[in-house]
């Protein structure tokens, strides 16, 4: 309060309070001359008690005369929001959970701006968060990695992938892939899928089911496992391509045929709903779906003909206690 070294406090300050007014009487006097050089500045804390929310006046006094007055406010602090409630954290976490990577600058700005445009409108934010979240689930990048992996397991081994299998393998499928108009991402993605498909083809679990089969048996068994019936012409064309083009550069192989059949549009449509449910558990809850929960959401999604908005699926997952507990 007194910046000049020619003052000293010679009496312990007295603190008093009257309602919203707090006074500190410090009893200051002039102090000059050689002895003033011995004065050492110090700080002292004063207990003014617990203050309720409101506006207060703090008076600094000397000899009962107010020399300075400060007004301040105590504001009630709401419970701290969880990190996932913030737009930046929400978007960043979706990149990690669904695309297995950090956000790229353009994508991050686009999605956070979508939420920022809502301002403080709670209903707008609720809908916006659902739409942003669903966009990741349905993004080209996730469809070409997460859904492709799901179909690989489901269409060849007749089972869903586990969460432990899904996480590292999806990361490999999406390695160095960022979907952007000015980036040759399709080339990298196709290369990643070729590598992954070849590795999957050589796994013991796959070979136990498909090794030793003729080309025709191999193709028929893949379609049978998928639950898809191709046209006779389509089936025969695939078999003939294997029979008459083996070991020739540019000709189909069992690996390339595997990828072709896994990407069959009829199979994609057939398993989309079950994949959507499974990948929500993997992405949001970071675990395998429990049987009851999986069947409940699959039945509901089927009842709404695949309309996840009307089924309120994304909303249910991102507002669930289990999801929010991930971000204390």
Functional labels for PLM-detected ranges:
Residues 78-328:
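Composition-driven recognition of low-complexity segments enriched
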């Amino acid at each position: 309060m007194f910046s000049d070294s020619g003052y000293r406090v010679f009496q312990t300050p007295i603190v008093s309070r009257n309602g919203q007014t707090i006074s500190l009487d410090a009893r200051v006097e002039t102090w000059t001359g050689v002895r003033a050089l011995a004065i050492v500045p110090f700080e002292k804390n004063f207990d003014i008690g617990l203050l309720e929310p409101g506006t207060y006046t703090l008076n600094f006094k000397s000899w009962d005369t107010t020399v300075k007055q400060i007004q301040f406010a105590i504001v009630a602090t709401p419970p701290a929001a969880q990190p996932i409630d913030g737009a930046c954290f929400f978007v960043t976490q979706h990149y990690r959970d669904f695309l297995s990577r950090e956000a790229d600058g353009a994508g991050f700005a686009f999605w956070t701006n979508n939420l920022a445009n809502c301002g403080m409108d709670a209903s707008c934010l609720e809908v916006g968060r659902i739409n942003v979240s669903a966009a990741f689930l349905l993004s080209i990048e996730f469809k070409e990695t997460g859904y492709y992996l799901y179909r690989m397991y489901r269409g060849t081994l007749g089972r869903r992938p586990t969460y432990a299998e899904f996480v590292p393998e999806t990361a490999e499928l999406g390695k160095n892939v960022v979907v952007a108009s000015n980036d040759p991402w399709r080339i990298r993605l196709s290369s990643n899928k070729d590598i992954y498909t070849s590795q999957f083809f050589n796994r013991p679990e796959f070979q136990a089911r498909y090794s030793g089969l003729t080309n025709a048996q191999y193709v028929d068994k893949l379609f049978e496992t998928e639950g898809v019936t191709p046209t006779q012409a389509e089936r025969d064309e695939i078999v003939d391509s294997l029979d008459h083009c083996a070991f020739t550069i540019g000709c189909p192989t069992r690996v390339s045929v595997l990828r072709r059949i896994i990407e069959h549009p009829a199979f994609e449509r057939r398993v989309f709903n079950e994949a959507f449910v499974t990948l929500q558990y993997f992405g949001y809850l970071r675990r395998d779906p429990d049987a009851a929960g999986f069947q409940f959401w699959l039945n509901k999604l089927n009842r709404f003909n695949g309309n996840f908005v009307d089924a309120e699926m994304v909303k249910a997952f991102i507002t669930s206690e289990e999801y929010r507990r991930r971000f204390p």
